[in-house]
Amino acid sequence: MEVGYSNTVVLRHVKQALENLLAGNVCLTEGVREIAQWRWANHGLNEALFRPFVGVDSETDSFPVGRLRELWSEDGLARADAERVAAEGRYREWILESGGIMLDAVVAALPTSTFTDPASS
């Protein structure tokens, strides 16, 4: 099932998040979270493309990433990072494959995307 219309701004955000994840610019956990947050936005993509990211986000939601890490003790971070790295190892191949498939879908959708909802015209 497709969600909403193909909004150019949303697709650009999803594309950037996918490119960052696939290039290794962010850890797998952070990349998955960035992608999963767009699942209900107007992207016009098949919602099934988001399922791997939503699932792994759910499995890794206890791990601190980004600015949240500043609030953790060194010992706590060391333990959480060891667990996170192990979890990311289990999901890496699946997520990178899913990311490539989703990026292809985003790139294909961008040329026909719009900045406004065509139904509101």
Where are the language model's segments positioned?
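Acidic, Ser/Pro/Thr-rich low-complexity regulatory regions
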Residues: M1-S121
